[in-house]
């Protein structure tokens, strides 16, 4: 299985005020592959990631998953559930009144897991990141790095087929950033997901299978 991006164009505005943000983007990401998107501010990275996640519609072009358009004409997932696409953002966005384990189990239950299944999955993921002793604490009791690790595991809670990460390490120091990317890569490889991450940090490029460079809405050679 693969995610195939075919000639994606995105324009904002109309007429004289029209801005062309993406100008014919083509690439493919295989199952189990971890790809980094890089480019200067305004190059179109976040717009592209947002389109891939179904949060924004393209002006033209197609995104295919398993040889099927990822979204139908009403822009709903056609071959995937929404839960099959996991998002990781720069900020953790944890719910302040939920305990750490509840941040994950709630996601699992909303996706159809039983309470027992959700709890078992959440505990295992939190063990993977060394937070098994923090299950019952609240976000304000966590460090910034711990919050981000919880947010990352939350994105993996439903075993999504596609992971999209937008600058997940931007607020972390070099050591924590490395650990976070190693964690993301490990999950993608072990679960054979499709992973795409935006980052400006060239020190992290070595963890990717490929780096795709964007410039002025186009992929550079």
From Swiss-Prot:
ABC transporter domain span: 3-221
GO terms under cellular component: plasma membrane
Xref: Pfam families: ABC_tran
Entry keyword set: ATP-binding, Cell membrane, Membrane, Nucleotide-binding, Translocase, Transport
EC number: 7.6.2.-
Gene3D superfamilies, sorted: P-loop containing nucleotide triphosphate hydrolases
EC class (word): translocase
Domain of life of the native organism: Bacteria
CDD domains, A to Z: ABC_MJ0796_LolCDE_FtsE (cd03255)
Alphabetical list of PROSITE patterns matching this protein: ABC_TRANSPORTER_2
Membrane topology classification: Peripheral membrane protein
Record-linked SUPFAM superfamilies: P-loop containing nucleoside triphosphate hydrolases
Gene Ontology MF annotations: ATP binding; ATP hydrolysis activity; transmembrane transporter activity
Cell location: Cell membrane
Residues given in the record as ATP binding sites: 39-46
Similarity field: Belongs to the ABC transporter superfamily. HrtA family.
Protein role: Part of the ABC transporter complex hrt involved in hemin import. Responsible for energy coupling to the transport system.
UniProt subunit comment: The complex is composed of two ATP-binding proteins (HrtA), two transmembrane proteins (HrtB) and a solute-binding protein.
Descriptive protein name: Putative hemin import ATP-binding protein HrtA
């Amino acid at each position: 299985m693969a995610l195939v991006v075919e000639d994606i164009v995105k324009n904002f505005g109309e007429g004289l005020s029209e801005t062309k943000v993406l100008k014919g983007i083509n690439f493919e990401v295989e199952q189990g592959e971890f790809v980094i998107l890089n480019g200067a501010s305004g190059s179109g990275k976040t717009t592209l990631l947002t389109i891939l996640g179904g949060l924004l519609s393209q002006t033209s072009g197609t995104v295919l998953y398993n040889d099927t358009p990822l979204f139908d004409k009403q822009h709903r997932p056609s071959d995937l559930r929404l839960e099959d696409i996991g998002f990781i953002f720069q900020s953790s966005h944890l719910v302040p009144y939920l305990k750490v384990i509840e941040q994950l189990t709630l996601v699992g239950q909303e996706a159809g897991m039983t309470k027992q299944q959700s709890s078992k999955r959440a505990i295992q993921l939190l063990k993977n990141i060394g937070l098994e002793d923090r299950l019952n604490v609240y976000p304000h009791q966590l460090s910034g790095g711990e919050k981000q690790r919880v947010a990352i595991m939350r994105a993996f809670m439903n075993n999504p087929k596609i992971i999209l990460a937008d600058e997940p390490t931007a607020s972390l120091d070099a050591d924590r950033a490395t650990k976070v990317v190693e964690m993301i890569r490990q999950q993608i490889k072990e679960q054979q997901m499709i992973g795409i991450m935006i980052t400006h940090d060239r020190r992290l490029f070595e963890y990717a299978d490929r780096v795709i460079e964007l410039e002025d809405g186009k992929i550079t050679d």
